[in-house]
Every structure is written in C-alpha cells, then in structure tokens.
Amino acid sequence: MSGTSSIARSTMAYVLAGGRGSRLLELTDTRAKPAVYFGGKSRIIDFALSNAVNSGIRRIGVATQYKAHSLIRHMQRGWNFFRPERNEGFDILPASQRVSETQWYEGTADAVYQNLDIIAGYEPEYMIILAGDHIYKMDYEIMLHQHVERQADVTVGCIEVPREEATGFGVMQVDDTGRITAFLEKPSDPPGMPGQPDIALASMGIYVFKTKFLFDVLRRDAADPDSKHDFGGDIIPDLVENGTAIAHRFSDSCVRSSKTAEAYWRDVGTLDSYWQANLDLTNVVPTLDLYDSGWPIWTYNEISPPAKFVYDDVGRRGMAVDSLVAGGCIVSGASLSRSLISTGCRVHSFSQLHGTVVLPYADIARSARLRNTVVDRGVRIPEGLVVGEDPELDAKRFRRTEKGICLITQPMIDRLG
C-alpha cells in the first residue's frame, strides 16, 4: 500500500460508473457494468476504488446512471468507512438533473461538470478521473507525481494493446518525451506504435488534472453546442492540440504480483474477456494477485460460513482442483476444475464443472455438466443439464459467443420448460 503523501491527500478521485456495458449481454440487464460480480466476492468497481484508497486518496466521488441500484447498495454497504472529520469523503452521485431539469449525464465530461459544486466543497488541488469498469492494480500516486513534475495540463494513463483490439479505445501517439501528439477516439484503423506496427498505445480512461484547470475546461466544454461532452471524444483531443498532454505508461505504476510479472489490465467488456479474466485467477501463480495483503481489493464482505466440501464416495466426491470457491458454498459430491464459484452457491452430487464462472447464490442441481460457462446470480440449474458439449444446442437455448463461451440466466432456464 502506498504511503499517504501530501499529493494524494490533496487529490480527489472521481469514478465514472454510469455505463451499461452492453457487450456483456444479459449480465448487465439488471445492473451497470461496474456492479458486475468478479473474482468470487468482489464487484468490478472495487478495483478502481481500492486503487484509490491504497494510493492514499481519501476523497472519492462516484457518478452513477444506468440501473444503479445494485451498485449503489454495494457501495453503501462496503465503502462507508470514510471519516468526514479527517476531510475524507465518499459521495455517490447519481444523475439527478442538477444543471437542467431535462438533462441527465450526457457524456463522461458532463458527468463531472454537473457535480462541480460538490467537488469544490472538498477543495482538492488535483483530480484523477477513473473508469469504474476495468480490472487492474495501479498506484495512482506515481501518476500524480509525474503530472506535477511534467507540469502537464492533463496526464493520460495508457497501455499497449494489440492493434486489432484498439478500435474500442482512445488511441494515442507520443513523442520521445512522452508528450501526446495525436489522440483518436475509437478509430476504425488504429495507428501502430513506431517499430511495433501491430501494437497500439491505448488510453486507460484515467486522467489527471489540476482541479482549477479542469473546472475551466469543463465550463468551456459545457458551453460548446457542438461538443458531445466526452473526455475521450472532446476534452483530450483538444488538450493534445492546444495544451500539454502527457502519457503515463501503466507499466510504470502497475502493482505486480512479482517483479517479473506482466502488467495486468483487463477491460472485461465482453463475455469472453470477462470469463477469461475470472479464470485467470485460477492459475497456480495468477498475474493478478488477490492474495496480496499489501495492496488489498476492498469490498463488501457478506457474512458467510466457510466453504464446505462433502462426500468421499467413488463417483461422488466433493472436490475442487485449480479453482476458487468463496465463502458460504457447499460442494456436495460434485467435481470442480478450473472454475470460480462465488459466495453462497450450491453444487450438488454428480455434477461436473470445468472452466465455469458461477455468480453468487446459484444452485447447480445433480448430474449437471457445465463447461466454459458463466452462470448468472441466483440461477437454478436443473438436474442433468449439459452445457458446453453441443454448440448448436447451446446456441439455441443460451447465449453463446463465437469463442464458445455460454452465458446462462434464469429467464433462459425458465424458457426450457
């Protein structure tokens, strides 16, 4: 955990958590993407919030919009430990037509602009704007120091990604000093990096500003009728052209599982990437280390008993290999391999799960076989259901991606009759 320096103490983190994340399909039918469960007991938003707290930042605002109830309830239960008497604060900021009776949040920049008065009440010297829907560990204090040292108007967090995956990101080009010379939001043909034509330098959706400067920029943007009021589409391209925009490499501030580990950052914006990021945690030495007490991922800890494995008969042995099983689960004569089972689930006798991510309070009946599957919260899998062995049948009954990952929700089960 980072030491609480004066720069962290004088910074406010502002988390943008209003997006749906439609590429996660039915997983976001009832909840915003930042509220989606991850890693057995956490939510996606816990990573950005934990990074802020671990970096020494004690003033946080979270802007919410799309189907925010689940997200707000989670934060009220798990993130209520800040002390106002120490100038700490945690504000949940739903879209509430604060500027206009007809205007909700119309873009990422507008989601900050509409709450300038609340931000001003904390009197932060610096602002760090964060996306609430990525999985990573990062020491924001290092990025803040770079911003101050370079005297930048804005510092943009960036990461190298395969060029073919960069169409969904802001893509930048930088000079030898790290100054951003061009910024394209979600280009159809992303430019490669010098000497690495197959790699693009993508924005992480993390921006550092001096607060007074940010206020001026947002007020000008709000008055521009041609703006879409978006950081990636409007604010950053303008500052690249007319100001000083500096790139901060994620590799410089990533909190790694070991000195030789890769810098782990995942967008988890699709069902395939979400499934893979969860199963990454089942590796013997995962690149993203949830067991690191020096940089913990804070969350709401439900009161639950330890996980329990029962029966040791031939063909009916409760066991798990290369798997994570959260508290409150009972694995009763079932076999799990390379799977992640969230809080409060039941897996009944003779069932077999491989490469399966099960969200909280699901119930897997006897003799089910699930392979390469995501099971939504509270789903009741019927006895003998087989998923992941017949692609054509899976596609008819459930949501199946081109890579063969199946999503199962309760309405899909109900339609089976």
UniProtKB/Swiss-Prot annotation:
It comes from Granulibacter bethesdensis (strain ATCC BAA-1260 / CGDNIH1). It is an enzyme of class 2 (transferase). InterPro entries: ADP-Glc_PPase (IPR011831), ADP_Glu_pyroP_CS (IPR005836), GlgC_bac (IPR023049), GlmU/GlgC-like_hexapep (IPR056818), NTP_transferase_dom (IPR005835), Nucleotide-diphossugar_trans (IPR029044), Trimer_LpxA-like_sf (IPR011004). PROSITE patterns: ADP_GLC_PYROPHOSPH_1, ADP_GLC_PYROPHOSPH_2, ADP_GLC_PYROPHOSPH_3. SUPFAM superfamilies: Nucleotide-diphospho-sugar transferases (SSF53448), Trimeric LpxA-like enzymes (SSF51161). This is Glucose-1-phosphate adenylyltransferase. Transmembrane segments: none annotated. Belongs to the bacterial/plant glucose-1-phosphate adenylyltransferase family. GO terms for biological process: glycogen biosynthetic process. The gene is glgC. The lineage of its organism: Bacteria, Pseudomonadati, Pseudomonadota, Alphaproteobacteria, Acetobacterales. GO terms for molecular function: ATP binding; glucose-1-phosphate adenylyltransferase activity. NCBIfam families: glgC, PRK00725.1, PRK00844.1.
